[in-house]
Amino acid sequence: VLRGTRHINRLGRPPRNGDTLNKDMEDYLFTNLLDSISNKFMAQTSDELCRRMDVTREQADAFAALSHQRTEESIRTGTWSEEIVSIQVDGKTIGPKDEDHFVPGTTRQSLSNLRTHFGPDSLVTAGNASGIVDGAAAVVVKSLDRAKSDGDEPLARIVSWGIVGLEPAIMAYGPVPSSKLALDRAGASIDGVSRWEINEAFAGQAVACMKDLGIDQSIV
């Protein structure tokens, strides 16, 4: 079982959670979201990539609006209802809960009214970037023989993967070289992929990666 947890509220002791006696106060914007090598926040590495790739605020907002609209539609149709589970906390059942970060009715126009947060030439706003939230996910990985013996029908097959290091100032560019490496190892091409996931925090970053890879946002 492979599982991952994002419990950001418990990383450090951020001021928004309230202060307690004899405890240090930490701002996780600096303790967790700042790259010490380039001295840039994660959002700023996205902005740097967007400048190099000529990605505009309008393009970032357009893709963010599409993401919000896709989320709204998936909730309406129950697309992911079978993959969202309730959890027990202190004897109480919590969830399943709809995605709590998107805003129903979001449009490119409504996003364009939001201010940027990392300087006058930044593309990042509260509407075209991921929120700082908690979450967890898990997946079961088995050999094909074990899946057959257990009577399980595989949903997917792991063919290859790629891990690539790059200039810290453009950390946001990572999906491009890592995807190319994974495809090369699999003997596949970009054109041969019918569905992509660029699981990143900033819409501008995703647009830049799609632009460099030459893929259409309709399959991302």
Feature map (PLM): residue ranges:
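Beta-strand segments within the central parallel beta-sheet cores of soluble alpha/beta enzyme folds
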Residues: 1, 61-66, 84-89, 152-163, ...
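Flexible glycine-/small-residue-enriched beta->alpha junction loops
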Residues: 1-48
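Short glycine/threonine-rich loop-to-helix capping motif typified by GTGT followed
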Residues: 96-101, 168-175, 200-218
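Glycine/charged-rich beta-loop-alpha catalytic/anionic-binding loops adjacent to active sites
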Residues: 24-30, 116-125, 157-164, 218-220
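Active-site pocket-shaping loop/turn-to-helix segments
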Residues: 33-41, 51-54, 58-65, 122-138, ...
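Phosphate/pyrophosphate-binding loops at sites that engage ATP/ADP/AMP, CoA/4′-phosphopantetheine
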Residues: 49-54, 147-154, 180-195, 210-216
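N-terminal extracellular/periplasmic Venus flytrap/periplasmic-binding protein-like
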Residues: 59-149, 212-219
